[in-house]
Amino acid sequence: MGDLLKRVFSLDVRSIALLRIAAAAVLLWDTCDRIRHLADHYFADSAIPFKIAEEYYKFAPTWSLHLLSESNTYQTSLFILQAIAACFLLVGYHSRIAAGICWILFASVLARVPPLLTGGDMLLCSLLFFLTLLPCSQCLSVHSKFKAPAGSVYSFATAALLLQFVVMYTVTGLMKLNSEWVDGTALMIILSDTGLAKPIGLWLTNFPAILMALTWGALLLELVAQVLLLSPYKTNQIRTVGVISYIGLHVGIFITMEVLVFSIISIAGLLSFIPSSWWNYKPLSILTTAKSNDGDSTKSDTSTSALPVPTTFPKISNAIAAWGLFVFLTVAAASLYTYTTNIYISNKIAVVAHQFRFDQRWEMFTQPYGLCYRFVAEVRTADGRFVDILRSSEERSDREAVPLDTIKFKSSRWLLLYRQMVSSQYYQQRIPTAKHLLKYNPAVGMPTVEEINGKELRLSVWVGSPEDRAAKGPAMMTYFDFRASGNYYFGEPHGHWVQRDDQGRIEASGKYDQGLREGKWTNYHPNGQTASSGYYSGGLEHGDWTTWDADGLRSAHGPFK
C-alpha cells in the first residue's frame, strides 16, 4: 500500500520545476496586466473604490495588505514588489521564499477587488501556496545552475497538487450534468455569444456537429479526472493520456473564449504531472542531466524510486499541506452539496477557507444560458435624448428592444467586472461602476457621460437565451443621478443628500438611511424658495409637514400618518 501511494502521488522534481517557471510567468503576466489597470480598478478614485472591498468583507473577515492603505503610491508599490518576487520565482532564486511572498501578495490583491475574482485566480493562488512546500528550486534554477537531475518526490503537498486538479475537474463535471451539456448544445450556446467567444470560437459555430462532439468530450474528460490522474494501474502511462488531454482541453478553451488566466494557469499546473519518462525524450531531455529510471516509466508499476520531499521541517510542512488539502476538499464537498440540494452549509467553513484563499467555486460554464448577457447603460442627456453609451453616442431608436450586439470592452477585466455585477453577490459594485462612466467609458470608442452632458443613468441587463431575454425583459441593475450629491453605503444612498435639477438648482435636501428617506427633508421651487418641509420615517412622510408657494407664502400645514 505504501508503494502504491508513493507511485500515485509522487511527482518528478523536474516537472515541479516546470510548474514553478510556468506559474511565475503567469503571475508576472497577470501582475503586469493588473498594473495596466491600476488607475481603473485599484486607485482611490477607480471604478472599484477602497470602500467596496471594506463593505464586501464587513461580515466575512479577511486579510489583505492592499486594504491597509488606499494611497495610490502604496498600491503601486505592492504591485512592483509582487513583480519582483515573481521574477525571483521564475529564475529559482530562493524559490520557496519567493513563492511564499508571491502567495501573500497575490492572495492580498484578490481581497482588494472582490468583483474581479475568477477561478483562474483561485487556482494560481493555490499553486503558489503548495509551491512553498515543494522542492521547486532543485532543478532549472539559479541554485541548481539550471541543471535538472532526475528524481521523484512525494508528500502531502504533491498529493494536494494532484487532488486540486482532480477536484476541479470532477466537481465541474458533476455540476454540468444538466440538459445543455448532456444534449451536447452547451458549447454552441456559449460560443454563439459574441461577448464571451473569441473569433475562432465564433467560427466554430458554423460546425454544430463538431461542437456537439467537443461538448461531450469536455464533459467526459472532467468526469474521469480521478482515473486519468490517479490511476494506480500503469500510473505514468495513463497519466500521460490525462496530461495531454487536459492540456488540449485548456488550449481549446483559451483560443475560443475569454477566460483571462484560467486556461494558462491550468496548463502550468498540469506541467507538474509530467511523468519521469517524458524527460528521456526531446525537447525535455535537453534540459536534464540524467535519464529517468523509474520502474513505472517503461515496464511495470510495482516499484518506485520516489523519496520524501526534502525540507528542514518535514512534519510542519506536511501538516500545513495536509491542512490545506483538508480545507479545499471540504469546501469542494460543501459547494457540491449546496449546488445539488440548495441547502447552504455553515458560513464558518468558507470563512476559514478564505483566509488561505481555498474558498474555490468550480461552476464555470455549468449553466450556459446564464452567461449570455446584454447590458444597456442608458443615459438621459440635458436635451432629452436617451443614449446607450456602451454602444453608441446616438439616441436609442427602440428603448424597449433587446440589443442584438454585445459590447466591445477595452479589456477582458472590464468585461469580467460587468458580468460579475449581475450577481447579487456584488450588488454594491454597481453604483461605483455607473459613477465611473462620468469620465471614463470602458467600451471601445464610446463617449463618457460628461461628453454627452448626461444627467441620469440606468444600467440594465437582459439574461438568458434570446427567447428568455425577449420574454422576461431587462432587470435594472442600478440607477445613478449625476446631478445629486451624497454618499452610499452597501449600494444604497446613505447620509446627507442634495438633489438638483438639470440646471443645477437644488430640488431637495435631507438624509437617507440605507436607501430610505429619514428625518427632516426640504423641497424647493425652481426659484430657490422652499416648497415643502417635514419629516420621513422608513421612507414615508411622517408627522407635521408645511408647504409654501413659489412666493414663499405658506399654503398648507398638517400631519402625515
Residue ranges and their predicted role:
Residues A471-K561:
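Glycine/tyrosine- and acidic-biased, solvent-exposed loop/turn segments at the edges of beta-strands
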